[in-house]
Regions:
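Generic short beta-strand segments
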Residues: 49-58, 150-157, 192-203
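Surface-exposed strand-loop-strand hairpins of Gram-negative outer-membrane beta-barrel proteins
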Residues: 60-76, 84, 88
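Tryptophan-anchored aromatic micro-motifs
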Residues: 41-65
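Positively charged n-region of N-terminal signal peptides that target proteins for export
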Residues: 1-4
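Bacterial Sec-dependent N-terminal signal peptides
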Residues: 13-43
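Edge/loop elements at the starts and ends of beta-strands within beta-rich repeat scaffolds
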Residues: 41-45, 147, 184-191
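Predominantly extracellular/secreted and cell-surface proteins with exposed
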Residues: 80, 84-179
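Edge beta-strand at a domain terminus
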Residues: 24-32, 164-229
Length: 229
């Protein structure tokens, strides 16, 4: 009886393993392999520049004239240029350099908070990135992948209303750039950065959703061009 029980357990285990192998959700993705992640991230590593396109509306849906406020480098026709850096395997983040977060003041409803934010210097914003298959059903046979950017929070300390406050700007980066791993070199593509909420002392004081006709703070970095590798 004991031997029969052991045989049944062994057969059940074999069936279970066989089922896992056939189920595509258990197939090891090409883009989950450490060697692939290391190779792709080190290939992306370097300095890039891009056209910077802010789309900023206040509650009255008036677009901000950002070109007159931009203090940095511009193209021949006056479009702002932003620089950013992709870290390699050891630091898989993209750092947007000298982002004018003081412009967020144009969409803030709290007047005192808006006045304090308007005085902020430019900030570097770091966004973690990762790789994934763009077609999960094909499993490891597919080398079509995508770059995924994670959310990022920018903390600042501000004095307003007679008190010191910890303010968090919560950014979302919905961009997902699809690429073929067999075609090199890969490029980061367009990066889109959206302000989703403003948090003061651990309390959400304002949510930003331009799609509902409210305030909007959206920055689009156009096609990327490497300036050094």
């Amino acid at each position: 009886m004991k031997k029969i029980s052991m045989v049944i357990v062994a057969i059940s285990a074999m069936i279970s393993l066989s089922g896992c192998h056939e189920d595509p959700t258990y197939v090891d993705s090409y883009f989950q392999r450490q060697s692939v992640i290391e190779e792709l991230s080190n290939e992306l590593k370097g300095q890039y520049s891009s056209i910077f396109i802010p789309v900023i509306y206040n509650a009255s849906q008036e677009q901000m004239d950002y070109k007159s406020l931009w203090k940095g480098e511009v193209t021949e026709n006056g479009q702002p240029i932003i620089h950013y850096t992709f870290g390699g395997y050891e630091n898989r983040t993209v750092t947007l350099q000298q982002v004018p977060i003081s412009w967020i003041s144009f969409v803030i409803k709290d007047i005192k908070l808006a006045e304090a934010v308007k005085l902020l210097p430019d900030y570097d914003i770091s966004i973690p990135y990762s790789f994934a298959s763009s077609d999960e059903e094909t499993g490891e046979a597919s080398k079509m992948g995508k770059i995924i950017y994670s959310d990022s929070k920018v903390p600042v300390t501000l004095n307003y209303g007679g008190k010191q406050h910890l303010v968090l700007f919560n950014f979302k980066c919905p961009s997902q750039f699809v690429f073929d791993a067999d075609k090199r070199p890969i490029s980061p593509g367009r990066i889109q950065l959206e302000l989703k909420s403003i948090i003061v002392d651990n309390v959400i004081v304002q949510e930003i959703n331009g799609y509902l006709g409210g305030e909007c703070f959206l920055s689009i970095m156009g096609k990327t061009d490497p300036i050094s590798k």
